[in-house]
C-alpha cells in the first residue's frame, strides 16, 4: 500500500519569499536553512512567518487572497451559460435524461411548479368534498372508541379516588388516595 505525499498550497506566496531569503542568507555567508528549519526544537511554519497584520486580514476575509499575478485567473466564458447540461426528470415511474441549457431548465421547472400548484388547489377542494359526504357512523364509532379508552385509562390510574366499586373490584379492602395515605403517615 503506497502512501501519498501531502499536498501543500502556497496561497500567500511564502515559498518564493522564503527561497529568496534563503538565497540572500547563503550569499551573505550564513548556513542555508530550509523552510522547515528548527529553531530551539520548534519547527517554524508558514503561519509563524506571516506578518500579524497580513494574518488578521487573511483570517477575516471570506475567501483566500487572489493568487499571485503569475497564475492565470480563469475567466467565465460567454458560451458557458448556453452550454447544455444533463437534466434528469422522474415522471410516472420512468427516468428520462435530457441535455438542456440552464435557461430552458429553469423554464421547465417553473412550468412544472405552476402546474403542480394548480392541481393541488383543485385536488384540495375534491378532498374536502369527499369528507363532507362521508357518513356520520365513522365519527360516532370514533367517539365511542375514545370514550371507552378514556374509561380504561382512568380505571388503571395509580391514584384511585372512588374506592373498589368504581374500579369494579370485588375485594373488601378499601383503596385510599395518595393524599389520604400521606396524611396518615405524617400524623403518626
Curated annotation (Swiss-Prot):
Per the annotation, the residue ranges of the short sequence motif Jas are 135-160
- Example of a GO biological process term: regulation of jasmonic acid mediated signaling pathway
UniProt keywords (A-Z) are: Jasmonic acid signaling pathway, Transcription, Transcription regulation, Ubl conjugation
InterPro entries per the UniProt record, alphabetical: CCT_CS (IPR018467), TIFY/JAZ (IPR040390), Tify_dom (IPR010399)
Report biased composition (Basic and acidic residues) as residue ranges.
Answer: 179-188
Q: Which GO terms describe its cellular component?
A: nucleus
What Pfam families does the annotation carry? Jas_motif (PF09425), tify (PF06200)
State the residue spans of region: Disordered.
20-41, 156-188
**Entry's transmembrane regions:** none
Record-linked PROSITE patterns = TIFY
Q: Where is the composition biased (Low complexity)?
A: 28-38
Task: Reproduce the UniProt comment on modification after translation.
Answer: Ubiquitinated. Targeted for degradation by the SCF(COI1) E3 ubiquitin ligase-proteasome pathway during jasmonate signaling.
Please report the stretch or stretches of sequence annotated as the Tify domain.
Answer: 80-114
Record-stated family: Belongs to the TIFY/JAZ family.
* Domain notes per entry: The jas domain (135-160) is required for interaction with COI1.
**What's the stated role of this polypeptide?**
Repressor of jasmonate responses.
PANTHER family membership = PROTEIN TIFY 4A-RELATED-RELATED, PROTEIN TIFY 9
Q: What is this protein called?
A: Protein TIFY 9
**Record gene name:** TIFY9
Amino acid at each position: 500500500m503506497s502512501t501519498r505525499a501531502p499536498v501543500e498550497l502556497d496561497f500567500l506566496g511564502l515559498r518564493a519569499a522564503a527561497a529568496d531569503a534563503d538565497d540572500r542568507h547563503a550569499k551573505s555567508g550564513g548556513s542555508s536553512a530550509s523552510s522547515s528549519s528548527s529553531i530551539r526544537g520548534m519547527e517554524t511554519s508558514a503561519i509563524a512567518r506571516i506578518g500579524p497584520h497580513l494574518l488578521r486580514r487573511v483570517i477575516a476575509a471570506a475567501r483566500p487572497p487572489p493568487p499571485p499575478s503569475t497564475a492565470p485567473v480563469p475567466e467565465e466564458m460567454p458560451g458557458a451559460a448556453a452550454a447544455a447540461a444533463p437534466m434528469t426528470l422522474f415522471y410516472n415511474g420512468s427516468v428520462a435524461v435530457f441535455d438542456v441549457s440552464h435557461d430552458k431548465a429553469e423554464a421547465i421547472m417553473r412550468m412544472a411548479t405552476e402546474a403542480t400548484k394548480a392541481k393541488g388547489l383543485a385536488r384540495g377542494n375534491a378532498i374536502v368534498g369527499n369528507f363532507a359526504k362521508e357518513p356520520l357512523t365513522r365519527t360516532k364509532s370514533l367517539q365511542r372508541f375514545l370514550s371507552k379508552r378514556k374509561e380504561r385509562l382512568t380505571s388503571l390510574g395509580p391514584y384511585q379516588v372512588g374506592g373498589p366499586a368504581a374500579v369494579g373490584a370485588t375485594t373488601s379492602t378499601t383503596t385510599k388516595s395518595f393524599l389520604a395515605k400521606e396524611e396518615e403517615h405524617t400524623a403518626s
